[in-house]
Swiss-Prot record:
It comes from Nitrosomonas europaea (strain ATCC 19718 / CIP 103999 / KCTC 2705 / NBRC 14298). Pfam families: Ribosomal_L27A (PF00828). One of its GO terms (cellular component) is cytosolic large ribosomal subunit. Binds to the 23S rRNA. GO terms for biological process: translation. Disulfide bonds: none annotated. Residues 1-42 are annotated as: Disordered. Keywords: Ribonucleoprotein, Ribosomal protein, RNA-binding, rRNA-binding. Belongs to the universal ribosomal protein uL15 family. The keyword RNA-binding applies. HAMAP family: Ribosomal_uL15. This is Large ribosomal subunit protein uL15. The keyword Ligase does not apply. Residues 21-31 have a biased composition (Gly residues).
Length: 153
């Protein structure tokens, strides 16, 4: 087999449209564009959303809502993920060192997930869900919070 002998599979590629090659081809004379009108001309077509002078839909509908530019995305980490790291104390710098977060200043929330933890751990300076906090304390772990919510208040 050589590169110049490779052909696409049967039915996988449509044949090229040869227009303007006689009426017997089915695409002669007007080349499948019909007679006259804007769409038959070269370069003649309307822009997307144009409705022939009628007020377009995107302008008929009212504006709604706004974009919050200062919103911070919270990175959620499951307790079962922390179980995979052989440490007993977790804080933002530990999560950063192990590659669980990309920026040490990004807000992180520890969530329960679907698996329970098997050992006592200490969580410091991280946002934690109620279920995760109960699971940590049930195993004899400790949760020290200095961060109350996403904005650090």
């Amino acid at each position: 087999m050589k590169l110049n002998t490779i052909k696409p599979g049967i039915g996988s590629a449509k044949p090229k449209r040869r227009v303007g090659r006689g009426i017997g081809s089915g695409l002669g004379k007007t080349c499948g564009r019909g007679h006259k009108g804007q769409k038959s001309r070269a370069g003649g077509f309307h822009k997307v959303g144009f409705e022939g002078g009628q007020m377009p839909l995107q302008r008929r509908l009212p504006k709604r809502g706004f974009t919050v530019y200062g919103k911070k995305q919270v990175r959620e980490i499951k307790l079962s993920t922390l179980q995979l790291i052989d440490l007993s104390e977790f804080n933002p710098s530990v999560l950063y060192d192990h590659g669980l977060i990309k920026n040490i200043n990004d807000p992180v929330k520890i969530i329960l997930g679907n698996q329970l933890i098997k050992r006592a751990i200490k969580i410091k300076d991280l946002i934690i869900s109620r279920g995760a906090k109960e699971a940590v304390e049930q195993m004899g772990g400790l949760v020290e919070l200095t961060v109350k919510d996403v904005n650090g208040v």
